[in-house]
Amino acid sequence: YKRQALGIPWRMRSVRERFEREVVDYFTDSYFRGRTPAPCTRCNSRIKWPCLAAEADALGIRYIATGHYFRITSAGGKRYVTRAADNRKDQSYYLWDLPQEVLDRVLTPMGTVIKRNIVEELADRRESMGVCFLEGRPCRDFLRSRDKTEALRPGPIIDSAGHRLGTHDGAALYTIGQKKGLDLPPGWAVVAIDTAANRIVAGEEKLLLHRTLEVGECRLVESDEVFGARDIRAVIRGIGRNPEGYAAVFPAASGIRIELEDPAWAPAAGQPVVLYRGERVVGGGILERYYYCLL
């Protein structure tokens, strides 16, 4: 936006090294471990919001705001990330990991507006989409540029019985549920990835239906509100289809265990699982394991 039209002073701080370490390296390492990361979520909790808060502190400014589409609501003395009025552009899923000390000072100017009204004001600016640091490159080209150990090499595609089906270009280049770029039988997809052995397991799509999820790196706004509740919904983005119905959440050694009323299709380790109660984000975490696992 033309900041001059609003009379807003401009200050810039470089956080390149921190971004490289916290987001880009995390993204790369996750894929090389056979996981499917969500870099935007990590950037929000590790870079954008804490750096913005720190800069505001240095200037003696109490409140902070961005152009994200979400709202803040309060309940029981807690602040909650809440879905935006524009459901098509809602970004609450990517903000589940923001701590209370940040939410306490957040203003959400975009939370109650419809994006098409804003687009009319910004008609000369392209909408940002995708992973910013890829700069338009395919993800696999980026990963090849970061392959320092020559891990990306051809390997076997097998079925659950160990029968060879074909050859892949490097296990880290694929994700759970993927079909594109693989010569698989009709109705089959990637069901497991073993980067240590450089192999991919393929199988029927029904093998990707999971009801039980184990989630780590959790943040719950109020655990008593989540455990035992019967109106929690779990949202999982990525290549898979999001589960319908409600979810039951239980404490577990690794974080939380989620039992889905209806199965999720193709959830991938490394993806955020975000818990909603109505419009409010009540918690979330990173998917570690699911009930059916071939490896």
Regions found by a protein language model. Name each.
Residues 2-123, 134-153, 189:
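Core alpha/beta nucleotide-donor-binding catalytic domains of modification enzymes
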Residues 59-60, 73-80, 146-153, 161-163, ...:
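Short, glycine- and charge-enriched coil/turn segments that flank and shape catalytic ligand pockets
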Residues 81, 154-157, 234, 273:
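Short polybasic amphipathic segments
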Residues 84-86, 176-187, 233-241, 264:
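Short, solvent-exposed secondary-structure boundary motifs
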Residues 85, 157-161, 236-239, 277:
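Short acidic, glycine-rich loop/turn motifs
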Residues 111, 116-221:
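Anionic-ligand-binding alpha/beta catalytic cores of soluble enzymes and soluble regulatory domains
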Residues 194-295:
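Basic, glycine-rich polyanion-binding accessory segments appended to enzymes
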